[in-house]
């Protein structure tokens, strides 16, 4: 069982004595910067030259510097830019300013675990990862609550790495809900597996296949969309609220019986075997190498997939149906910038 830390376990004063730099101002970056600022921490934001986020950050009352300037000034540096850009930014703008005793933080362990970023031995390296999107991290903080999170230490040069991580987690509100102790290896590998096999890859493939089966059988695309994609949120929300048992308690007996007797025929032992293969590819670094090489080549495979998926009939049908749903338009407006990639 994981060790869980709360407000009482975290000394925010430890962070208030230091200067913090948030590198990036996207979904997580804006939430971290604003929550830390409101917790009384000395925060600055580091952005690339010409970043569109500069005006947003300054409009929120934050001090904006270049990544290099922010890294030079700060004692604690949180890297919140995309995985594929971290190595270059780190090598060119952060590493030259990592003097002894500083702390380097990440919200995802990819580049540390797969040795793309190689910090010097005399700095602390740790992970603080809220388990929710940035707008929720911010909203919960403002409401006096918090999002559960993860904390991990990769390198403890000062003897205070975990304490700094817990202080940071408290500053953004996570220790209000609880912060689970983990490792860079566990966070990285389970996060990638969840994305690929279940949350993104698995769910998207299941939805698309279900849609295609119904349309190929002669049913209207609109009906197929409702049954295989739109209503998925209803089921996921129930699982989110109370697990599989609550979902099954909340649906009809017909749906529950079909769940038990037909679900394992769709996602069966063969699917589980493929999941194991995917996990091994992650553990062995094969996926990381593939993704790194893809980005070094300019992302041609990703571009082909994006174009092909955008042209799938489910997208056109979905757009027409979502235009009928005013609450979806309102939700998208509420969760827009700064929540972009």
UniProtKB/Swiss-Prot annotation:
Where does it sit, as one GO cellular component term?
A: cytosol
- CDD domains the record matches: Glyco_tranf_GTA_type
**Alphabetized UniProt keyword annotations:** Amino-acid biosynthesis, Branched-chain amino acid biosynthesis, Magnesium, Metal-binding, NADP, Oxidoreductase
Tell me the GO BP annotations in alphabetical order: isoleucine biosynthetic process; L-valine biosynthetic process
Q: Where does NADP(+) bind?
A: 25-28, 51, 53, 83-86, 134
Q: What class of enzyme is it?
A: oxidoreductase
**What are the binding positions for substrate in this chain?**
252
Q: Which residues bind Mg(2+) 1?
A: 191, 195
UniProt KW Repeat keyword:
no
InterPro entries hit by this protein: 6-PGluconate_DH-like_C_sf, KARI, KARI_C, KARI_N, KARI_prok, NAD(P)-bd_dom_sf
Family assignment?
Belongs to the ketol-acid reductoisomerase family.
HAMAP family for the chain: IlvC
Q: Please explain the role this protein plays, according to its UniProt record.
A: Involved in the biosynthesis of branched-chain amino acids (BCAA). Catalyzes an alkyl-migration followed by a ketol-acid reduction of (S)-2-acetolactate (S2AL) to yield (R)-2,3-dihydroxy-isovalerate. In the isomerase reaction, S2AL is rearranged via a Mg-dependent methyl migration to produce 3-hydroxy-3-methyl-2-ketobutyrate (HMKB). In the reductase reaction, this 2-ketoacid undergoes a metal-dependent reduction by NADPH to yield (R)-2,3-dihydroxy-isovalerate.
Q: What is this protein called?
A: Ketol-acid reductoisomerase (NADP(+))
Organism of this sequence: Anaeromyxobacter sp. (strain K)
**What is the primary gene name for this protein?**
ilvC
């Amino acid at each position: 069982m994981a060790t869980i830390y709360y407000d009482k376990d975290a000394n925010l004063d430890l962070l208030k004595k230091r200067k913090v730099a948030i590198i990036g101002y996207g979904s997580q970056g804006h939430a971290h910067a604003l929550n830390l600022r409101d917790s009384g921490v000395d925060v600055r934001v580091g952005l690339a030259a010409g970043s569109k986020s500069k005006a947003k950050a300054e409009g929120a009352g934050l001090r904006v510097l270049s990544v290099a300037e922010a890294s030079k000034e700060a004692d604690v540096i949180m890297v919140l830019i995309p995985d594929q850009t971290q190595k270059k930014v780190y090598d060119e703008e952060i590493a030259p300013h990592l003097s002894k005793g500083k702390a380097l933080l990440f919200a995802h362990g990819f580049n540390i675990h797969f040795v793309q970023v190689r910090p010097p031995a005399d700095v602390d390296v740790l992970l603080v990862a809220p388990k929710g999107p940035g707008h929720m991290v911010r909203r919960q903080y403002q409401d006096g609550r918090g999002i559960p999170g993860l904390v991990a230490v990769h390198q403890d040069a000062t003897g205070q790495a975990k304490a700094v991580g817990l202080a940071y987690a408290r500053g953004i509100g996570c220790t209000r809900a609880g912060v689970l102790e983990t490792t860079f290896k566990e966070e990285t590998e389970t996060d990638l597996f969840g994305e690929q096999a279940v949350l993104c890859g698995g769910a998207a493939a299941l939805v698309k296949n279900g849609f295609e089966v119904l349309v190929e059988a002669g049913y209207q695309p609109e009906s197929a969309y409702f049954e295989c994609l739109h209503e998925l949120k209803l089921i996921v929300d129930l699982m989110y609220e109370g697990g599989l048992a609550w979902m099954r308690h909340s649906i009809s007996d017909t749906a529950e019986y079909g769940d038990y007797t037909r679900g394992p025929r769709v996602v069966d032992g063969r699917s589980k075997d493929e999941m194991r293969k995917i996990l091994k590819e992650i553990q062995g670094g094969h996926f990381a190498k593939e993704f790194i090489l893809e980005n070094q080549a300019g992302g041609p495979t990703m571009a082909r997939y994006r174009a092909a998926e955008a042209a799938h009939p489910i997208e056109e049908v979905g757009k027409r149906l979502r235009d009928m749903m005013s609450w979806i338009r309102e939700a998208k407006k509420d969760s827009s910038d700064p929540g972009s990639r």
